[in-house]
Amino acid sequence: MTEVRAGVDDVDRRLVELLGRRFGYMDAAARIKPDREAVRDEWRKADVLAKVDSAAAELGVDRKLMARIYEDLIETSIAHEMDEFDRTRA
């Protein structure tokens, strides 16, 4: 069990690093977008979800699970980007 937990801890650390990079891109997007309404882009959301679904299918990962996780991640990202948009224009 110790090895399993160590493996999970390693994956979690990598995920935190990758999510930090992802949110850095959200910060950049918030600075680039011309207005707050541009932050929520339903076409882009659908595109990301489709790419994740394709990657999950290719890698043999549970597609429904990935869809749920990414739905939450995208909504959290949008909220973060809106906050960053507001902060940079205050």
Residue positions per predicted region:
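Domain-level signature for soluble enzymes in the chorismate/prephenate branch of the shikimate pathway
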Residues: 1-90
